[in-house]
């Protein structure tokens, strides 16, 4: 019998100071983390005789213990609360699902700076521009930059070992700073200066400078140079025509739209830097049942801006579609401390800010509606599959597939679905070794052993295990898994998915461990769910296989050369920029690689020419 928490005795020990509290259930699992300006006052509110919130009632009924940490200020409490939420992922807290850092454009502090995509902590010396909504937006910008400002994008190791310009120089995508005779340090620094201004949003300043350069070149009858400057000017103006610019020029701000319905919330963030819209992203936090919209919005705001704060730029202005219920000053102070400058919230914007907020709210509502419709489709498919397999519930499914080319570079994949669809953070790949090439049974056996031999949490035990294969694959999989499910509280249903002779979608044969075969109509929602998880598993396996095969083939040409071991192979590929670059290198260039003598360079050169 669960022991009732003695709230009266506990509250007598609680201070009126600010701090953080952690609530535990009977299994000593943290189920809620909160902060308070006055701990005693806040914790007492949970144990009043009349509590309106159903969520609070459910939370209190599960409390077995409460730990309290006192802090000096409410700001400290806010940051500590965030750290605890991230550490424990409590059941009753609103949780930020997407905790990935945003990508930036990085301009290195090298003598000849390199421009590249960067994600993560800002530890390298250089300048960071962004954030951008996703890596695709960064790559698109880098591609554009190559055409207008041909600053190098190659790795420093490749740059350091070049004696002649690469293909990027030949097609006008790099100025060629790796070779001193191609461009001077002064001219390259000027080019980098234009790029820096462009990334800072100072397009007009760049245009003024380029127009001046074009006019001077024309006056000096340097018509080729003038034409080059003219092309740069035209390219920048085309970019300006395509890009929406804020009336609040040079301003950095995030605009947060919000929508919540049917247990799904969406916060859409529009990112504006230097007055330009860099892009946007929708977030769908994980919400405990019966959580009100205000708590969702407040919790998301603090978690979002305090997560990865070393890699995330907090803008000076944050536009919100509603007031915060929490202490606004404390949150602003905490974010200002992290950002290193004053951060302000605005909840009743006008002018262009108001239009941005309306746009962000519209996007939040649209994304939420799409999510709800997707969830309804997923729910229908899960119900159909439960009916087909006569199961009471399906909380978790896993699917396995094998990928290789003629037995080479074998990879196994495992993908996971729950009632909301794919759980991509739990996808896994297994590098298969020590088997006969092409032996799919052995590969599947090895993958399943590595997956299930270790102790599993109860919630990680699947209700269904799909095997992408026929009877032989399924039987082998069953032989492996029965060795481990003796201590499991439930036995997964195992289903094989055979593609059939024509391998056309909709004609799959489904096989049980008893050897029974059955088919589902091509329009059956249950079949669509099975096809979805099968395709996810196949794509995950083949992506891993292709990466492994590419890496293997990159080094295989060097493996038969006497005197070239793993370390030297790695050095050769690293310092020349890849196998194709190595094949084009001269003996003298190969000899410049650390650890490679001139005589060995000649052997390598001759071997690669055969």
Curated annotation (Swiss-Prot):
Residues 16-94 form the GIY-YIG domain. Pfam families: GIY-YIG, HHH_5, UVR, UvrC_RNaseH, UvrC_RNaseH_dom. Its main location: cytoplasm. Keywords: Cytoplasm, DNA damage, DNA excision, DNA repair, Excision nuclease, SOS response. InterPro entries: GIY-YIG_endonuc (IPR000305), GIY-YIG_endonuc_sf (IPR035901), GIY-YIG_UvrC_Cho (IPR047296), Hlx-hairpin-Hlx_DNA-bd_motif (IPR003583), RuvA_2-like (IPR010994), UVR_dom (IPR001943), UVR_dom_sf (IPR036876), UvrABC_protein_C (IPR050066). Residues 204-239 form the UVR domain. GO terms for cellular component: cytoplasm; excinuclease repair complex. GO terms for molecular function: DNA binding; excinuclease ABC activity. It is found in: Cytoplasm. One of its GO terms (biological process) is SOS response. The UvrABC repair system catalyzes the recognition and processing of DNA lesions. UvrC both incises the 5' and 3' sides of the lesion. The N-terminal half is responsible for the 3' incision and the C-terminal half is responsible for the 5' incision. Interacts with UvrB in an incision complex. HAMAP family: UvrC. Belongs to the UvrC family. This is UvrABC system protein C. It comes from Vibrio vulnificus (strain CMCP6). The gene is uvrC.
